[in-house]
Amino acid sequence: MFNDCIFSPDRKYRYVLKHRWDDLMPEKACMWIGLNPSTADEQQLDPTLRRIKGFCITHDFNCFYMLNIFAFRATDPKVMKLESDPVGPENDKWLKETSDKCALIVACWGGHGKHLGRSDTVIALLSGHGKTLHCLGKTKEGYPAHPLYLPGDVALKII
């Protein structure tokens, strides 16, 4: 398996991970926006990405793009929050560009999205770019819920 990834030159930030499993058909892509990248890279999918792939297959997509509201790579949100620039210098550019390639955009960044007001910023950025964001559910605080913590058959909702 190989995933196309776009990293910063020092690999401190991962802006985009693309995973496609059916090259015989035209690309039908879904974009997911999480909190921040973990260790997933060109060679491996983490549990969240495997869950996302299952959702995409169920809904007849053959590709997904994974982006995040913060592009800094960390497995712990506490570590990400200590970073001086967790967003990354090119993240907003990649969010807008990638959204143009996708039939569906699903937000899933959870409650930590309130850090630096980033949840509201990204919703405004993509809404201003003419995009409609969806989610699989919301946290108690009203943020788009993470897919690992939801049943596999949950229905999409517009944010």
Predicted regions and their residues:
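Active-site and ligand/interface coordination hotspots across diverse enzymes
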Residues: 1-46
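Short acidic (Asp/Glu) patches
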Residues: 11, 15, 46-53, 85-93
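Residues at the starts of beta-strands that form the adenosine-phosphate
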Residues: 29, 62-63, 104, 132
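A short mixed-secondary-structure module that forms the rim of ligand-binding clefts
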Residues: 38-60
